[in-house]
């Protein structure tokens, strides 16, 4: 056995069904499509989701909700995520994107209070929770709310 004479394991492959190749093949004439009718024709067959004229499922179910076109996409950053920054550094949108904490285009950044921090940082974000503000200021840092 070498690369020049490989063959599949016995029983692992199945011969393809050759349609419309004479009556002796068992799949000649109509090629397994039956006699006449919509599905026997070229391009025949119903569209996906068609249920034979019955009211389809996607129309039987009620509509729900809407998309608010004025919604703001606010990225969330927690205090514990700020451990990636050195003491005394300025943490703003650019710095957060550089560290991979904020991805893509966002309308604002909100700092939340999950976790702890032991050294001072200057944080510039558009929104901040009360607990996050207390923790940053307790560590000797400063919060600057930008719009």
From Swiss-Prot:
Keywords: Ribonucleoprotein, Ribosomal protein, RNA-binding, rRNA-binding. The keyword Ribonucleoprotein applies. It comes from the Bacteria. GO terms for molecular function: rRNA binding; structural constituent of ribosome. Residues 21-31, 42-52 have a biased composition (Gly residues). Signal peptide: none annotated. GO terms for cellular component: cytosolic large ribosomal subunit. Part of the 50S ribosomal subunit. This is Large ribosomal subunit protein uL15. It comes from Desulfosudis oleivorans (strain DSM 6200 / JCM 39069 / Hxd3) (Desulfococcus oleovorans). The gene is rplO.
């Amino acid at each position: 056995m070498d690369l020049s004479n490989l063959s599949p394991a016995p029983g692992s492959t199945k011969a393809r069904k050759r349609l419309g190749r004479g009556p002796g093949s068992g799949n000649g004439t109509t090629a397994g499509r039956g006699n006449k009718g919509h599905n026997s024709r070229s391009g025949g067959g119903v569209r996906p989701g068609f249920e034979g004229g019955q009211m389809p499922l996607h129309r039987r179910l009620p509509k729900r909700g809407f998309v608010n076109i004025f919604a703001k996409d606010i990225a969330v950053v927690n205090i514990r995520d700020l451990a990636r920054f050195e003491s005394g550094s300025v943490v703003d949108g650019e710095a957060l994107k550089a560290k991979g904490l904020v991805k893509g285009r966002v309308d604002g950044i909100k700092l939340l209070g999950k976790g702890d921090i032991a050294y001072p940082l200057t944080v510039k974000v558009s929104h901040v929770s009360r607990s996050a503000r207390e923790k940053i200021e307790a560590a000797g840092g400063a919060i600057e709310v930008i719009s």
